[in-house]
Regions:
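Generic hydrophobic alpha-helical segments
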Residues: 67-68, 112-116, 206-214
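Short, surface-exposed acidic/glycine-rich loop or hinge patches that mediate macromolecular interfaces
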Residues: 10, 100-103, 205
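Conserved catalytic-core segment of NTP-binding enzymes
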Residues: 80-192, 198-199
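A short, Lys/Arg-enriched amphipathic alpha-helix followed by its capping loop at the start of a domain
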Residues: 19-28
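P-loop/Walker-type NTP enzyme "switch/lid" segment
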Residues: 2-14, 28-91, 107-110, 160-166, ...
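NTP-binding/hydrolysis catalytic cores, primarily Walker-type P-loop NTPases
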Residues: 189-239
Length: 239
């Protein structure tokens, strides 16, 4: 059964690519779909200018600019990117709004999150989280439930800036994840835009946690912690 993850906002293509690679190594069939108006996710994937109404292979995962007719039967997980355009016609099992904490004004992104929050849908609530030290030490007993959609705030010192952001915009901490990024994240992000081999061993532990959380949610009851650690390490090396 296909699980649909909807992503709004920006600055998330590296998160989607890394997570898709890990899930592929776990034996899942994954498709990345860019339904944004400016096709910004497409720019992170080489050699696909003008791709329309077809599915191509990228690093063992599928990529398309629209939802294939056979998606429900052909894939386990779909990461669907919509940019800044809210699409109430698509039901997502999980919904995310991603923003950069270094934006001059976060108000437009918070307003987008509020629009998504107002949509009438019934997402799954249970998500699994890794320990704070990253994917090397996964605690199977650590889990939490939150209300969707999830607001993801990324950037340098995002965790320390979160309290100010929450105070300014009345953001509910239960549905928000603040994730610190550093120079290693930026290097890997630039690399995945231009290199055909995507490696991400230099990313921050907070970002590894975010990948782990997304992957565990997609895997659900099928996850195997030992195999997941191997799949994560393999994906980090670009395999």
């Amino acid at each position: 059964m296909l699980t649909k993850f909807g992503f709004y906002g920006a600055s998330c293509y590296d998160w989607l690519l890394y997570s898709a690679k890990v899930l592929k190594n776990c034996g899942m069939d994954v498709i990345l779909i860019d339904m944004s108006e400016n096709k910004s996710l497409s720019y992170a994937i080489p050699d696909i200018p003008g791709v329309k109404n077809q599915v191509i292979d990228y690093m063992g995962c599928s990529f398309a600019t629209s939802i294939p007719k056979d998606a429900e039967d052909a894939y386990d997980t779909a990461f669907i990117y919509l940019g800044d355009t809210v699409n109430p016609s698509i039901h997502f099992d999980y919904t995310f709004c991603v923003t950069d904490c270094e934006l001059h004004s976060m108000k437009p992104r918070i307003q987008l999150w509020e629009k998504i929050t107002a949509l009438d849908y019934a997402p799954s609530q249970k998500m699994i989280c890794s320990s704070e030290s990253g994917a090397d030490e996964i605690d199977p007993d650590e889990e939490f439930t939150t209300d969707c959609p999830h607001l993801i705030i990324l950037g340098p010192m995002a965790e320390s800036k979160y309290r100010y952001i929450a105070g300014q915009y009345s953001v509910d901490s239960k549905s928000c994840n603040a994730v610190d990024l550093d120079e290693g994240n930026m290097d890997c992000r630039i690399s995945c835009q231009y290199d055909t081999v995507v490696r991400f061993s230099k990313i921050s532990d907070s970002f590894k946690d975010l990948i782990t959380k997304l992957c565990f949610t997609a895997l659900g009851d099928t996850r195997d912690y030992k195999n997941f650690k191997k799949a994560f390490k393999k994906a980090e090396r670009g395999k």
